[in-house]
Amino acid sequence: MDLANHGLILLQQLNAQREFGFLCDCTVAIGDVYFKAHKSVLASFSNYFKMLFVHQTSECVRLKPTDIQPDIFSYLLHLMYTGKMAPQLIDPVRLEQGIKFLHAYPLIQEASLASQGAFSHPDQVFPLASSLYGIQIADHQLRQATKIASAPEKLGRDPRPQTSRISQEQVPEASQLSQLTSNLAQVNRTNMTPSDPLQTSLSPELVSTPVPPPPPGEETNLEASSSDEQPASLTIAHVKPSIMKRNGSFPKYYACHLCGRRFTLRSSLREHLQIHTGVPFTSSQQGESRVPLTLCSNAADLGKDAMEVPEAGMISDSELQHISDSPIIDGQQQSETPPPSDIADIDNLEQADQEREVKRRKYECTICGRKFIQKSHWREHMYIHTGKPFKCSTCDKSFCRANQAARHVCLNQSIDTYTMVDKQTLELCTFEEGSQMDNMLVQTNKPYKCNLCDKTFSTPNEVVKHSCQNQNSDVFALDEGRSILLGSGDSEVTEPDHPVLASIKKEQETVLLD
């Protein structure tokens, strides 16, 4: 069972989200105009965006106004979200070019039918309607748009549009010269035909809508006030209330005035300047780069120029992807990656970590030199060298802890079964009384017997605390004296039992005699 108007409700909700910028995961920038949209909707109608989002994860897509104009993209975006033609007159030629650029094949048939039925003069450029749909426009763009409408004579004398530094860096010198000569030729034609200087001096790419000239009195006043400013590349006079100002989420680029490389960090730009000057880069203790006094003026001018944000000539998506993958943009966002002067030495960090780890590991094995953080870990490691201190008298199985020996049950266990405790090992490993729960587990029916004097005790702590005063203690003292003799170097006593030590000592004596 199909629900009525389900698709219409979905389109209305998506369009409302787009106009308010809610849940929009993509921003399309065309010059100074920014469109909020959803990637899924754009990819559904445009193969261009579909392939772009496959290979690019950026949330901002920058397009050139020469590829598709903002009014055309707004018209197509409204058609994608609503399925209806906007109440807006659009040039069919530019509309067809925009559809071909976006590869929006599902919209070709609808746009062609609308253009054939609604437009009888395809060569005429119609004005924009009262609104563009879901866009953002910079504040200076609106101010310059009102001034260009009232200063046609100023525009005729200086027809060069204001372009961003990114587009100027990518265009070769030959293309810039050819564009300059074409603009000069257009200026000459406007001087010869003064009837309509605004429409004939600029190409349709620079001015999308003709604006009627103001009265002569107002023209002179506005011309004097805007003598130091250049005209904008797009004239958009009406926006919707949902349009917001440009925020600081878009990255700023710091461009080198010598080679054109761009950086997102000013410190990276300062380091790059040393390549051109040949002066080695040095950093102070505060982590800030020091530049020679001869470069202060250039660096100051460069910093002012670099603060300008790309405006009219935005790069396309393919060029943006190429720039993001290439090493041209060396710096990253300051919140993600600090400048090189703020990054500490890796060797010093590793050395500090090692010293900190040594302070933490204060329990050291006297035999192999390993260090441990907890005393219990060190004690269990010592049992590797000395042997486990608790042993079952029936099955001769050894245990590290007393509670393990207490829980142990043998198949051949009898009433006479006991746990043999190695007193030497416990004294060497500084056996300590455990928690109350461990003591409850240790107190079992099996007694604990000392391996030196064969005395029986109820807990292993009593075995450690008692003193052996019989023959076995004397034997233990003799064994300790023998170990001391092994270390002192008496070769006559230790030679039959330790031939390896005797041979080493003989070699040392021969070396001393030679």
Swiss-Prot record:
Record's keyword annotation contains DNA-binding: yes
Domain BTB: 24-89
Any Gene Ontology biological process: regulation of cytokine production
Zinc finger (C2H2-type): 254-276, 363-385, 390-410, 448-468
SMART domains: BTB, ZnF_C2H2
Function comment: May be involved in transcriptional regulation.
Protein name, as recorded: Zinc finger and BTB domain-containing protein 2
Organism: Homo sapiens
Upper taxonomic lineage: Eukaryota, Metazoa, Chordata, Craniata, Vertebrata
